[in-house]
Each structure stands twice: as C-alpha cells, then as structure tokens.
Amino acid sequence: LRYKIMTNRFIILCLLVLVSITNSSSLASNKFAKFIVWNENRKLTWNDFNAKPERSYPNMEEAQTVSSIEVGYTSTNKKIEITIAAKFYPNLSWHYSNINSSYILQHEQLHFDITELYARMMRKQISEQVKSSKDKSKYNSIVKKIMNNWDNEQNAYDDQTNHGANKTEQLKWENNIQLRLA
C-alpha cells in the first residue's frame, strides 16, 4: 500500500508538470481539470469523491484522497512570481459506495489538511529564501525537500492510525494537525 500511495503522488506530480505545459483545450478533458483548493471553511463531503475504485482493497482502504501541492514559478526581468496551492482532485479520489462514515471522511479530510500544512510550509520557506530568479536552485531544493517531507508525513499518518482504524491515534493526529494549521 505504501508503494502505491507514493507512486500515485509521483504520478500526480509528473502529470501536473505535463498539464502545465499542455494547452488549455486539452486540460478540459484531463482528470486534473476539476479540483478543490483547500479552504478552512470548506470541508470535503462524500460527494467530492467521484472516481470509481480501481480494485478491491480488502481490510486496507475504504477511500482514497488524491491531493497535491501545486507550485507555479514564473520569472521575468529577475522578478519571480510563485503560486502554491493545496488541491484535492474529485475525479481521482474515491470511496466505496457502501462507505459513508463521517469518521472515515474525517480521516480523508485530514489527508487534505496535511497537504495544506505542507503548502503553507513551502510558501513560508520560499518567501523567506527565494528573492530573485538567481535563487532557482534554492527554490528547487525547497520544493523537493517539502514534497518529500509531505509524502513521509502522509505515510506516517496512515501507518500510525492504521488508515483511521486506530481511533486513539487518529484523534492525536487530528489535534496535532489542527494545532499546526492554527
């Protein structure tokens, strides 16, 4: 399962790069075209999970959240503009139709919250350390490090909570992430 999650994130990052260099007409048909930008006032609902499960994962997954940290970088006349957003992809995220538990939904929401947490970390580090187009290698280093840490924390979250089955650990994670987002 860990390999699958890491692979999905790697594929997502690669596809985001490809999407950014394709023209806008092909973007409309792409599964990444529909997304939800993280907002503290907008929580996920089961209606946001529109993909069909690819296969059965007995006793492992009842839902899957696909989210990303989308990073945009443009440079003109030595000035840089960087945009960073935590995004959730409804057309890639799924749940089994017989699963409508608010508890499982909260577990999936926290995956998206962790994505936002790392988007904020990236925004902060880049704004503090990247001042001009000369800092592109510093920018690349920050992005790589944050993405790696984000992936590690997502995996630790699932491992320690047993995908939400361990309610004591789940509550610890919820409290920790909410404090870090505050």
Residue ranges with predicted function:
Residues L1-A33:
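Bacterial Sec-dependent N-terminal signal peptides
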Residues S25, N91, N155:
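Residue-level marker of positions within ordered structural domains that often coincide
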Residues N30-K79, F88, V130-A182:
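Metalloprotease/metallohydrolase-associated module, dominated by Zn2+-dependent proteases
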Residues T76-S102:
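Active-site scaffold of zinc-dependent metalloenzymes
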Residues Y103-T115:
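Active-site recognition of the HExxH zinc-binding catalytic motif
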Residues F112, Q125, E153:
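Short alpha-helical functional segments enriched in proximate histidine and acidic residues
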Residues L117-I126:
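Membrane-interfacial alpha-helical segments at the cytosolic side of multi-pass membrane proteins
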